[in-house]
UniProtKB/Swiss-Prot annotation:
Phenotype when the gene is knocked out: Mutant shows increased sensitivity to oxidative stress.
One GO CC term on file: cytoplasm
Gene source species: Staphylococcus aureus (strain NCTC 8325 / PS 47)
Subcellular location: Cytoplasm
Gene Ontology terms describing biological process: protein repair; response to nitrosative stress; response to oxidative stress
MF-aspect GO terms: iron ion binding
Pfam families: Hemerythrin (PF01814), ScdA_N (PF04405)
SUPFAM superfamilies found in the cross-reference section: SP0561-like
The protein's name in its UniProt record: Iron-sulfur cluster repair protein ScdA
Annotated family: Belongs to the RIC family. ScdA subfamily.
PANTHER family associated with the record: IRON-SULFUR CLUSTER REPAIR PROTEIN YTFE
Gene3D superfamilies the record matches: nmb1532 protein domain like, SP0561-like
Conditions for induction: In stationary-phase. Induced by hydrogen peroxide.
Length: 224
């Protein structure tokens, strides 16, 4: 049974669908997930702890036996899972979404300057993530696999620390985009492109939070 003293990130690791519940009340399970459920709820002030625990325990009870939980994968298999479930889809979405973000800024930016800032923030986020994922695939993940196989990797702790630092910076950019878009709520006058961009940026945020959680709280723990 999930209780108020359980750590937010650990609950999501054990029951991945709990991420949806934490997200719905604005609780960070990603870079800020190393706090108790009680502490996270108190920080939000408007979250009823008992109701939150009830919802989380409902998820625990309906957890499907036999469904894939990445925490049970070994390091090399988990890395393959991360690459196929997150790295490849993110690269594809960046390629497809960027023209719409650019169009939104160009067409509506003159009258809504925050859309220009949104594009600039998105570009920083996109370029940082692309560079980060490529470095993981080419340099960092092979080191983690070598470590799992018993080889000596002298800088393994530095590798992990640097990746976590990158994730924190990524989280800050996501927060900024959410603030610029009023949590991705388009104004009444928003056109179809505007609504499309907000919808897909919100989905991108969800995917990135899941991605970072899996690396910070599952993958890195297996090699630290």
């Amino acid at each position: 049974m999930i209780n108020k003293n359980d750590i937010v990130a650990d609950v999501v690791t054990d029951y991945p669908k709990a991420a949806d519940i934490f997200r719905s009340v604005g609780i960070d399970f990603c870079c800020g997930g190393q706090v108790s459920i009680e502490a996270a709820a108190l920080e939000k002030k408007n979250v009823d702890l008992n109701e939150l625990l009830q919802r989380l325990n409902d998820v625990e009870q309906t957890n499907t036996p036999g469904s894939l939980n990445p925490k049970f994968l070994n390091v090399s298999s988990l890395i393959q899972y991360i690459q196929s479930a997150y790295h490849e889809p993110l690269r594809e979405e960046f390629k497809n979404l960027t023209p719409y973000v650019t169009k939104l800024s160009k067409v509506h930016g003159p009258n809504h300057p925050y859309l220009v800032e949104l594009k600039e923030t998105y570009d920083t986020f996109k370029n940082g993530m692309l560079e980060h994922m490529q470095k993981e695939d080419d340099v960092d993940f092979p080191k983690l696999i070598k470590y799992e196989q018993g080889e000596v990797v002298d800088d393994i702790n530095t590798v992990i620390d640097d990746l976590v630092s990158d994730h924190i910076a990524t989280g800050e950019l996501l927060v900024k985009m959410s603030e610029l878009t009023s949590s991705y709520e388009p104004p009444i006058e928003a056109c179809g492109t505007w609504r499309l961009v907000y919808q897909r940026l919100k989905a991108l945020e969800v995917l990135t939070h899941e991605h970072v959680h899996l690396e910070n709280h599952v993958l890195f723990k297996k090699v630290s």
